[in-house]
Amino acid sequence: SFRDVIAACASKEDTRGNWIDDEIFESYCALHQAGHAHSVEVWDEDRLVGGLYGVTLRGAFFGESMFHRVKDTSKVALCFLVDRLCDGGYQLLDLQWVTPHLRQFGAVDISRARYLTQLAESMQLDCRFDGPRSLRGGPVREPNRSGGRDSAPGSSSSGAPSARCAPSSRS
């Protein structure tokens, strides 16, 4: 659930999640109730293993935080989010800062002027991040030394980790 994703982001072992105190936690939950904050969750059977959350405003999504309990599951969440935003006609995904982790997916730094232009353009849109959607796939595989694929870290006995967007209460 949305609350579970924020709680996981807030309890990250590194210090990046420490900014999410009780007041901020409840504020984001209120935004979720109002239909403005959303999460993407990665599940292995009934266990939440990764995810992210952010806030939408018209044609922009402002990513706030992400977490993973199983290697690469935050990457699965990010890829699912980008696909969802593209399908929904969103024009801006604000990641706050570009890390090597995000750069591998095509994230780039842009100038303040370009950001403000893209933000203004995205405010002219009326995009919706409605309803739950899910994606179920086969096991997540890692290449072995010979270049083939043979292991499935974090996959369930069914071999099908899944990603889904949680609906807001308004959806």
Task: Describe each region flagged by the PLM.
Residues 1-171:
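N-acyltransferase acceptor-side catalytic subdomain
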